[in-house]
Amino acid sequence: MSRYWKAALPFLLAAVIILVAASRPVVLHIGFPCDSYWNVPGENYYTFIDAAIEKFEAEHPNVKVEYTSGIRVEDYTEWLSGQYLLGQEPDVMVILPEDFVIFSDTASLRELDPFMKQDPEVDLSGFYPAALQAGADKGKQYALPLECVPQMMFINKTLLQKEHIRIPDNDWTWDEFYSLCEQLTRDTDGDGIVDQFGVYDYGWEEALVANGCSLFSEDGQHCLLNQSAQESAMQFARQIYQLNAGTDLSDKTFDEGRVAFRPMLFSEYRSYEPYPWRIKRSSNFEWDCIAMPSGTSAGGGNYSRLSTLMLGISQRTKHSRLSWELLKTIACTEEMQTMVYTELSGVSALHRVTESD
């Protein structure tokens, strides 16, 4: 071999190695539970995620997205924590509501604000503020909402019709709610035992939200129970509880058609309303849902609790820009967020999707 080729060989080999490395696809990993967080049937998470991957890969040649299948929601937190301990966590991951504080406090998630500031395609004003706040900590955004589920007031329409009571409007108040519950809670067969009830499962948490207040300060350092809005919320919850005369109600009581009102997640309404799931839940009465009743304080309203599944990026990802693009594809595009409604049991956190015809 000539002296020239001996000198050039290392550079040629290096060039070949670089070309081979460049031709290999970048592989991103996404983590998600395969079943419903809200424990309802009919969710198609694989259909949803596979569609997102197909869209993302079509727009990003030489990038592949992989995932571990079969992780049930009850095992998801343990699985994800274990992957972090092994240094093998996914680049992009679904974050359960109860896990967000843990991951943000341990600096496990990458801050998203730098990506959003440089990305003209993302407009945070397009999200519902409450859903967006679920992924924020100390003024910084660490996750974006994937889907959210509000709490609604379910109504036994059959029972109201039997009692000649019209369905309340969506702007109803505590006073109307209490009056109806008081009217509906009674002994229907004359045996001296109350067997029909106005409401089941309405407690202090629902009352606090309706009155526009919370139990603790935003920093979690102070209990606010001694403030007037909190006091009136607790008092109202106590009055509602006392209406049932100490009777221990259950899901079965509602399913039997003996309760007029019950707060439930919108995901349950969506999943159980269609046939055949509907007959598994309640076959002897018609039901519907409306907004929760408004509290009496100045900050009160027809507000409800909101449960939000989020998407975040690992702090240790080696592909932060591509991970952001994948997260954005799922959480911020109209195409994928429309599929939240068709394939999952929640609603989109984007105004333009949820409020579209």
Task: Please provide the spans of the model-predicted regions.
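Glycine-centered hinge/linker elements that transmit conformational signals in sensory
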Residues: 180-181, 219-249, 292
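Conserved N-terminal structural module of periplasmic/extracytoplasmic solute-binding proteins
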Residues: 1-102
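Extracytoplasmic/periplasmic solute-binding protein
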Residues: 137-146, 151, 175-223, 261
